[in-house]
Amino acid sequence: MIWTGLLVGFLFGIVLQRGRICFNSAFRDVLLFKDNYLFKLAVFTLALEMILFVLLSQVGLMQMNPKPLNLVGNIIGGFVFGLGMVLAGGCASGVTYRVGEGLTTAWFAALFYGLGAYATKSGAFSWWLSWVGQFKSPLSVEESAYYVKGAGPTISSVLGLNPWIPALVIAALFILWAFGTKTTSRETKFNWKIASVCLALVAGLGFITSTLSGRKYGLGITGGWINLFQGFLTNSPLNWEGLEIVGIILGAGVAAAVAGEFKLRMPKNPVTYLQVGIGGLLMGIGAVTAGGCNIGHFLTGVPQLALSSWLASIFFILGNWTMAWILFRR
């Protein structure tokens, strides 16, 4: 069933490209331009996923599998990842789908993202990951219809509540904010509400098909790039997440071509390649240190109510705002 990763990735790539979805922009634009369009898209998607993930778990199509809590890793890795995404000009999913659009700076960012992630996971920087690993929290959830046994702690497990309760409460608050506040105008047929629904549905499909393949997690980016590097360097086979990356690039490429938006684009200043390469490297190191990126933690972990994902996501945003301030506002 690992081939389903290619299908899910293809759909994911189409949604990302048509919705112009980048979490770097979603976080950064709120600070720099008071533009909440993409941030609303992200928040509404999280609300839909919170309800969808619990529902799919209850009917037996998946079990949520929150990432372990590691205060040091989540905080440091999250902040470094946030710094890197601004330098790279896109988040993990943003640079990945833009590879398919023909943006050459995204090629460099993605290349160094994968390199940084691979080096931290099993290469030259693996000593750092081993050191961070000692701070992993022993807290976990008990096995149930909702959660895999031994998975990381969640808001519901810490409070001793059925996951439906915090999921519905938080989702309601997110929806009230998204629909109760003024939205920054943007000319697009694929508006934030439609994009959110499509993104949540792809996330749900990703969790179901990934579970059937034995992976037991939803959408991700970092592990896929690591798998591609492993395949190139050690000739190891592609897994579900590696095929997902291939699918994202293909889906975004097809969507861009159909819309007449595919074009090889190069920066006016070649030094930009150095900047995005450094940014990609920081993102890769940060993502592995934090235990996930803006997709594995923010888009997939936060809806599972994972404490690690909420913590890492807060520091994604803080790191993003810090580098945005240094580059554009200082």
Swiss-Prot record:
Coiled coil: none
Residue spans, topological domain Periplasmic: 1-2, 60-70, 122-162, 212-239, 290-306
Record's protein name: Thiosulfate transporter TsuA
Organism: Spirochaeta thermophila (strain ATCC 700085 / DSM 6578 / Z-1203)
Function statement: Mediates thiosulfate uptake.
Catalysed reactions listed for this entry: thiosulfate(in) = thiosulfate(out)
TM spans (from-to): 3-18, 37-59, 71-87, 103-121, 163-180, 190-211, 240-258, 270-289, 307-326
Keywords: Cell inner membrane, Cell membrane, Membrane, Sulfate transport, Transmembrane, Transmembrane helix, Transport
UniProt effect for mutating residue 91 to A: Cannot complement the growth defect of E.coli cysPUWA-tsuA deletion mutant
Gene (name only): tsuA
Entry membrane topology: Multi-pass membrane protein
UniProt KW Cell inner membrane keyword: yes
Recorded domain comment: Forms an hourglass-shaped architecture, with thiosulfate in the positively charged outer concave side.
KW Transmembrane (keyword) present: yes
Regions of this protein lying in the Cytoplasmic compartment: 19-36, 88-102, 181-189, 259-269, 327-330
Localization: Cell inner membrane
GO cellular component annotations of the record: plasma membrane
